[in-house]
Amino acid sequence: MKKLFLIFAVLLMTDLIAAKENQTVKLNSGYEMPTLGLGTWTLTGETCENAVYAALKSGYRLIDTAKYYGNESEVGNAIRRATKDGICKREEIFVTTKLVPWSNNPDRDIDDSLKQLGLSYIDLCLLHQHGSASGDDAVYKAMIRAVKDGKIRSIGISNFYTEKTVSHFIKNFEIPPTVIQNENHLKYQNNSLRDWAAKKRIYIESYYPFGGRGHTKEHLQNETVLEIARAHGKSAAQIIVRWHLQSGYIAIPGSSNPAHIAENFDVWDFELTENEMKKLNALDTGQRYENW
């Protein structure tokens, strides 16, 4: 298993270092997904729209939203602004949204997300979290129908942390998850799920890459992180983002500050050493901050 993951990580790193404009991985659906994006949880109104626009202007091509966030229309507005201003084309942007498991009509919710985003297709749609068994299955089946109808390109799940819970979607549905989006950071690395998922050609996507609100300071002021940051002339945030990427994760740090957004993306001109990665890996305590 360890050897397989090392091969998986090397292939990912080859993509990352190759070119700033080509930081993508190939999903088991056949589509390319950027490895670094902007998370928009808690961002609303003009703040959200301006943050997404700033991200696209800084080079990001992965934008993460969700129906539950209530900001899909603002994300869509930013995408239209960016494409109109010639910053990027729609087909260059990878948009992720999520559906809640308690939906009474997930097919309608998918259509509503498309309407709110102002898009003809969604690149990746995730089951946002575990609900009831019947609710989870209903949403997942709706996403599969949407794939067949051309409304969604890839599907996945979020907040599923064990092989057993993830295996349900692999064994019981014709289209497996491409991505598992979970809480993932230096203090909670869940390497066993990452290594197992790699064997299934499923990527782990890290939300809360800096620990999440209320814990960011603890991560950014960690002395091991700061020591490595000084060695590279980089910020603590950049070291942590780089750790996620070199560990084989997709990362979606969130921010509304254009300077921080740009800083988090400026990670393509250096690489952490094997020893530095070991030091950062050793910070794992198995501690999650959320119970979703």
List each model region and its residues.
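Sec-dependent N-terminal signal peptides
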Residues: 4-13
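N-terminal binding-site loop/beta-alpha segment at the start of enzyme catalytic domains
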Residues: 19-93, 142, 210-213
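Acidic (Asp/Glu)-rich catalytic clusters
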Residues: 27-28, 76-90, 111-120, 145-147, ...
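Acidic-and-aromatic substrate-binding clefts and catalytic sites of carbohydrate-active enzymes
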Residues: 41-46, 66-74, 100-106, 131-135, ...
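Short, acidic/polar
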Residues: 43-56, 103-118, 136-138, 163-167, ...
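A structural motif
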Residues: 60, 119-122, 152, 177
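Active-site groove signature of glycoside hydrolases
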Residues: 117-134
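Beta/alpha (TIM)-barrel catalytic core signal, keyed to glycine-rich beta->alpha loops juxtaposed to Asp/Glu
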Residues: 130-292
